[in-house]
């Protein structure tokens, strides 16, 4: 059975982070391509206590520290930067094609 949802985490410092805003804008731009409810995302704000906790969890899950900024797809580091729309869209399609 293939995935029906992709969960992305944007690892960034949220306050005043232009790259974080860019990543969200790109996600909002490509989301309609996949249909409603397929893409979910959250910002892991390394400038906040809760974000640092999740950052530590992701470091353990991914077996390495995610770069700041980076994009994690279904708990796998997909990009150590903010990709363009085409690259992110392709990565989401690949994640959807994987079996659950």
Pin down the residues of each PLM region:
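Local sequence-structure signature of Cys/Sec-based thiol-disulfide redox active-site neighborhoods
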Residues: 1-35
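Residue-level recognition of the N-termini of beta-strands and the immediately preceding loop/turn
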Residues: 6, 39-41, 69
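Conserved short-loop catalytic and cofactor-binding motifs
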Residues: 11, 15, 43, 76
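Generic recognition of short, well-ordered alpha-helical segments
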Residues: 21-25, 53, 83
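Thioredoxin-like thiol-disulfide oxidoreductase module
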Residues: 40-66
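Non-catalytic, surface beta->alpha helical segment in thiol-disulfide oxidoreductase systems
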Residues: 67, 72-100
């Amino acid at each position: 059975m293939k995935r029906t949802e992709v969960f992305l985490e944007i690892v960034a410092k949220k306050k005043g982070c232009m790259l974080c805003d860019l990543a969200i804008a790109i996600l909002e731009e490509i989301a309609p391509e996949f249909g409603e409810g397929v893409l979910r995302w959250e910002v892991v704000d390394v400038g906040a206590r809760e974000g640092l906790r999740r950052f530590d969890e992701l470091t353990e899950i991914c077996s390495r520290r995610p770069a700041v900024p980076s994009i994690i797809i279904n708990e796998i580091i997909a990009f150590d930067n903010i990709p363009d729309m085409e690259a992110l869209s392709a990565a989401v399609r690949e994640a959807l094609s994987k079996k659950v």
